A protein has these predicted regions:
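Composition-driven recognition of glycine/serine/threonine/acidic- and proline-rich low-complexity segments
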Residues: 2-200
Length: 200
């Protein structure tokens, strides 16, 4: 896909960073193909730089229920950033059905199997995303074990957003639609680099 055509609402100075994260997310999603047992591709992608304080409103407000997969990014000595994938609950359930080859609508809640499936999504996407960033930036990066959370957006995002506000009032949001030939799901990636990761 032509990411330059998909990048919107980004200042020219941010194009390289947005393109880097966009390609990384594309790589991460296509990594799900091995889990699904069939090709998973990105259908559309919209990359934006947004104010951190506005992030909960992107998901329906602080009290809206979300499911998030959180991965911390480790580099040379300290944590180099964070990756958070956010879904509406019904979308996350649909992703579980897609990956487990179940009829759409089979999953209606997060039990051990569903939580484990989404955790594996975090493992695969985190690894593929960081492999791309490592190859591109020359930094050795590795993901933490993923954490899967289902709660109100404000509760889930508060601790993560506090980390961002320590050094920036803006961050990157990547809205994606992806899936197989017969099913599609949508999700939002938050790419939260600290200055050392942005510097490459």
């Amino acid at each position: 896909m032509d990411l330059e055509k998909e990048i919107q609402e980004i200042d020219f100075a941010d194009i390289n960073m947005a393109g880097l994260f966009g390609e990384g997310v594309n790589n991460a999603i296509e990594g799900l193909s091995q889990m699904a047992g069939r090709e998973v591709k990105v259908v559309s992608m919209d990359i934006k730089k947004v104010l951190v304080k506005d992030i909960p409103d992107l998901f329906g407000g602080p009290e809206a229920l979300i499911i998030a997969i959180y991965v911390e990014i480790f580099g040379k000595a300290n944590a180099n950033g964070h990756m958070v994938v956010v879904y509406k609950p019904e979308v996350a359930f649909g992703l579980v059905d897609l990956l487990l080859d179940q009829q759409n609508g089979s999953t209606t809640e997060l039990n051990d199997m569903e939580n484990s499936t989404l955790g594996e999504v975090g493992n695969i996407m985190g690894s593929f995303f960081l492999n791309y960033l490592s190859d591109t930036t020359g930094q050795r990066l590795k993901p933490s074990p993923p954490a899967v959370m289902m709660d109100m957006a404000g509760a889930v995002l508060d601790s993560t957003l506090a980390n961002i506000l320590a050094y920036s009032d803006e961050t990157y949001i990547v809205d994606t639609v992806f899936g197989t030939k017969d099913r599609q799901v949508s999700g939002t990636f938050m790419i939260i680099p600290n200055p050392s990761l942005e510097a490459g």
